[in-house]
């Protein structure tokens, strides 16, 4: 140490000691406490603009979208305000209504068991009593009626379809609780259908399910007519639906079986051949009409399709797309059922029911990515620009559908059914977004998103698979819409336009108002796991005064936390990973005197085709003048009849361009309301040409000598010439296709695309017009024959 350093060091120590002394005694400071730490930084935020307009896209939300499969007890229905309660699933197909037993089918080794009430022991296992219990809880049951001819003979564990000892095979999988029960597949294993046991006797586990009793029926047979008659009595004689804003005259809801397109997988012990086009149409029509005969108030759902691939294809080796002009299955099925109903003069289909799983596979993803998938994949249901990460995003399985890697599921299904069977609503009786598991909070946020989508996109019936456990946050996601305050107040009845400028994978908003125009409810879902959403809310047509928030968050997943009511502010911050309901009071200065719709708002059209919409009043009484609003390039709408009143519908003609895709348009009304819709432009239509039999003259009451003949040419439609259905109808006389006769008949094209019918002229002289219509799934080409009876 250098000279002088020691004295400097000692001086420094002395100064330090004096400083510590005075600090400890209060010297040198005006306060006894250290200065407070700086406040934590605010959470990261994103800026979002939300625009709500109570005069745009107004429509009543069906109360039946707030449904579930198998809630765990009646209190669940009462607390959540669940409307539709479904008795369904694979086990519903072989359910025996007399002994309350079923077969687990492919879900568990094709083994008999009692109807499973373990998950919901408070419910009756008797299907008839189940209806009564659901109704007493305030819900509306939808019952599944099996269409296969077998039901479980008992609930014994040793009643199995593929006994290893009886059928002497080496099973690929064996029931761990009963060693004689195999899965019906034999070595070499690997999933090939050629390795299935096909010699099994259904009587091992089943008894026949027949429509009605006849002499000589096998012992133990069970009868549908007796069952449905009992169900109808439990539903009640009036059948009326006491639900506001919903015009359906009956609540006797029936699913006509479950996922009938995959019977050869789930129920291959009794249905080994792949389901086929004609089979599924004819079986549905026959059984549906029978149900209507036993219960005149029946509302029948079909075909209860399982999933994307089977919307468009069936597994039959001989009764498939290839033998039906290459028409995609659901368009073909709807078309065929519609034409059969036209011939019969009455409906057999009251709602198109599809299961709406997205087919996205989360199994190989990290937890964070599973959560992100759950919150982005909801776009499968509604976003025209969303390209699915599921397998079919890069594997087209359709023949004629537009942009089939972009599911656009709800508008696509509604467009299809409106084109193929007008006036038929859409049901989605199974769906789930539990990519990270039922208990994960991402599932609750995805559900909050889903319930909003269902109402905005005009689905009529929906039941979640299965009901969320009350211990999980997803339970409260439903209550945001149905019972947010414990007093059974819910989302308002009339959906209105609510849009935003954020990433839809991270943010959603849904809006509704009440008929009086005094309340606006918004559900805001901030799906961003990291960032709060600093949001500017622009309200059009509504003057707000007070707002109360109700929030579901990760920090309080088992309750909906109510905020205090306060004066409206147009700027609000929504924390990350939350779903928030805003209940806003105020006024609508120019509340419309009536509600109207585009009738329909969404429809499918072939490229280059034309469709006419017929705007109508759906409530209230006034007279409106409509005009064309904005529309996407690729379609051209023109108002051809501008008056809409209680006694008159308007008319909007829309001409599609030549590029398949999804095109949006708006129509404005003189009361400042606007309705928007979608045109789904598919591939170009096939052509149908008259090739023989036109312009004939014959004596009245005689058969014209030349059959009325058409030729179907698929062109660029995606179809083929052979196996196409052609619907012939005559203004007088009778048609025959060689098998059936009447004023309306269906003929099928041969391999060259040719179909024909014979015409018997009427008994009186005069002109006769015969119309021939090609498949709706190939653009619905048509031609007209003109004949003369002398």
Where are the model-predicted features located?
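Bacterial Sec-dependent N-terminal signal peptides
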Residues: 18-44, 673, 678, 782
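N-terminal module-boundary/linker segments of secreted carbohydrate-active enzymes
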Residues: 33-76, 234-235, 244, 281, ...
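N-terminal substrate-binding region of glycoside hydrolase catalytic domains
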Residues: 51-226, 255, 260-276
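Noncatalytic carbohydrate-binding groove/subsite architecture in carbohydrate-active enzymes
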Residues: 218-239, 277-442, 447
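Glycan-recognition and catalytic regions of carbohydrate-active enzymes
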Residues: 440, 451-521
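Carbohydrate-binding surface patches
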Residues: 503-543, 577-585
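C-terminal beta-strand-rich structural cap/linker in extracellular carbohydrate-active enzymes
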Residues: 566-589
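The feature marks long extracellular or luminal low-complexity segments
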Residues: 596-598, 612-617, 621, 628-790
């Amino acid at each position: 140490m250098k000279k002088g350093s020691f004295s400097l060091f000692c001086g420094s120590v002395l100064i330090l000691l004096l400083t510590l002394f005075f600090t400890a005694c209060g010297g040198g400071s005006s306060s006894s406490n250290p200065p407070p730490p700086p406040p934590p930084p605010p959470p990261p935020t994103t800026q979002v603009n939300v625009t709500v307009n109570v005069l745009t896209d107004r429509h009543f939300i069906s109360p039946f979208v707030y449904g579930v499969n198998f809630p765990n007890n009646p209190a669940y229905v009462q607390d959540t305000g669940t409307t539709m309660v479904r008795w369904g699933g694979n086990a519903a197909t072989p359910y025996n209504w007399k002994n309350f037993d079923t077969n687990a089918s492919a879900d568990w080794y094709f083994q008999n068991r009692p109807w499973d009430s373990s998950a919901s022991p408070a419910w009756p296992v008797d299907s008839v009593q189940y209806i009564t219990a659901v109704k007493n809880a305030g819900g509306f049951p939808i019952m599944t009626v099996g269409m296969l001819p077998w039901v479980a003979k008992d609930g014994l564990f040793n009643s199995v379809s593929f006994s290893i000892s009886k059928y002497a095979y080496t099973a690929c999988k064996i029931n761990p609780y009963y060693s004689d029960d195999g899965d019906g597949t034999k070595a070499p294993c690997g999933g090939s259908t050629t390795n299935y046991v096909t010699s099994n006797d259904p009587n091992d586990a089943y008894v026949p399910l027949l429509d009605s009793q006849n002499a000589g029926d096998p012992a133990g047979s069970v009868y549908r007519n007796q069952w449905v008659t009992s169900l109808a009595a439990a539903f009640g004689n009036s059948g009326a639906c006491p639900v506001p804003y919903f015009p359906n005259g009956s609540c006797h809801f029936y699913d006509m079986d479950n996922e009938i397109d995959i019977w050869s997988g789930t129920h291959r012990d009794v249905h080994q051949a792949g389901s086929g086009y004609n089979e599924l149409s004819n079986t549905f029509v026959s059984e549906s009409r029978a149900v209507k005969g036993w219960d005149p108030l029946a509302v029948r759902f079909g075909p209860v399709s399982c999933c994307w691939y089977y919307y468009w294809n069936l597994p039959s080796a001989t009764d498939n797309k290839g033998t039906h002009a290459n028409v995609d299955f659901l368009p073909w099925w709807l078309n065929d059922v519609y034409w059969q109903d036209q011939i019969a003069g009455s409906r057999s289909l009251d709602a198109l029911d599809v299961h709406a799983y997205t087919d996205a596979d989360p199994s190989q993803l990290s937890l964070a990515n599973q959560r992100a998938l759950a919150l982005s994949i909801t776009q499968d249901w509604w976003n025209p620009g969303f390209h699915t990460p599921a397998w079919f995003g890069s594997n087209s399985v359709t023949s004629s559908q537009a942009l089939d890697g972009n599911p656009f599921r709800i508008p696509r299904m509604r467009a299809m059914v409106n084109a193929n069977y007008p006036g038929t609503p859409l049901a989605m009786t199974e769906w789930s977004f539990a990519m990270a598991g039922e208990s994960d909070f991402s599932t609750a946020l995805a559900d909050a998103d889903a319930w909003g989508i269902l109402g905005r996109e005009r689905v009529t019936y929906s039941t979640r698979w299965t009901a969320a456990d009350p211990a999980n946050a997803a339970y409260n996601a439903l209550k945001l819409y149905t019972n947010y305050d414990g007093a059974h107040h819910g989302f308002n009845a009339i959906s209105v336009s609510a849009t935003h400028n954020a990433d839809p994978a991270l943010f959603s908003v849904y809006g509704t108002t009440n008929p009086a125009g005094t309340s606006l409810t918004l559900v805001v879902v901030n799906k961003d796991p990291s960032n709060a959403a600093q949001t500017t809310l622009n309200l059009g047509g509504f003057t707000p005064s007070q707002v109360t928030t109700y929030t579901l968050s990760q920090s309080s997943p088992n309750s909906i936390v109510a905020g205090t009511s306060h004066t409206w502010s147009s700027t609000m911050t929504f924390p990350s990973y939350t779903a928030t309901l805003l209940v806003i009071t105020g006024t609508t200065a120019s509340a419309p005197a009536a509600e109207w719709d585009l009738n329909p708002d969404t429809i499918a059209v072939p490229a280059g085709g034309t469709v006419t919409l017929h705007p109508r009043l759906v409530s209230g009484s006034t007279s409106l003048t409509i005009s064309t609003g904005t529309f996407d390039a690729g379609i051209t709408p023109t108002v051809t009849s501008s008056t809409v009143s209680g006694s008159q519908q308007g008319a909007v003609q829309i001409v599609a361009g030549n590029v398949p895709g999804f095109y949006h348009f708006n129509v404005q009304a003189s009361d400042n309301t606007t309705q928007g819709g979608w045109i789904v432009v598919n591939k170009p239509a096939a052509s149908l040409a008259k090739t023989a039999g036109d312009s004939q003259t014959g004596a009245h009451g005689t058969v014209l000598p030349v059959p009325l003949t058409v030729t179907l040419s698929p062109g660029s439609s995606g179809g083929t010439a052979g196996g196409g259905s052609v619907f012939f109808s005559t203004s007088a006389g009778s048609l025959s296709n060689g098998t059936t006769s009447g004023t309306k008949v269906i003929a099928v094209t041969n391999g060259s695309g040719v179909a024909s019918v014979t015409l018997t002229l009427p008994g009186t002289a005069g002109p006769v017009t015969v119309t021939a219509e090609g498949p709706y799934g190939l653009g619905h080409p048509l031609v007209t024959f003109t004949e003369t009876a002398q």
